Amino acid sequence: MSYKPIAPAPSSTPGSSTPGPGTPVPTAGSVPSPSGSVPGAAGPFRPLFNDFGPPSMGYVQAMKPPGAQGSQSTYTDLLSVIEEMGKEIRPTYAGSKSAMERLKRGIIHARALVRECLAETERNART
């Protein structure tokens, strides 16, 4: 479902106060554009989610410390994703579409983490 703004009706009289089709119409309830800065806002627009990489299942992942074990944190991430997926199984059986979508995203995320764990295991086996 896509949103298309409704253009204002063209004015038939040349001197009327109604703006023409090319003129932007400011309204009291208009939504600010995410591309520019909004007057009174603290800073530029920042989305609340990240479209890059696997989904986070609604929790924020901690940054890895410089000396942290890569495989240990990947493995713990995988365990937490599996735990989150377990919470979505019963609502999915009950017919919840949102739980089904979260479960799908969790499966995709878990598969990516399993690939990372396997790659790490192979790297460790070579050394």
From Swiss-Prot:
Recite the UniProt keywords alphabetically. Cytoplasm, Nucleus, Phosphoprotein
* Primary location class: cytoplasm
Region Disordered, annotated ranges: 1-49
Which residue stretches belong to region Interaction with CDK2?
65-107
Q: What does this protein do?
A: Acts as a component of the histone deacetylase NuRD complex which participates in the remodeling of chromatin. Inhibits cell cycle G1/S phase transition by repressing CDK2 expression and activation; represses CDK2 activation by inhibiting its interaction with cyclin E and A. Plays a role in regulating the self-renewal of embryonic stem cells (ESCs) and in maintaining cell survival during terminal differentiation of ESCs. Regulates microtubule organization of metaphase II oocytes.
Family, per the entry? Belongs to the CDK2AP family.
Q: What is this protein called?
A: Cyclin-dependent kinase 2-associated protein 2
Q: Record the organism.
A: Bos taurus
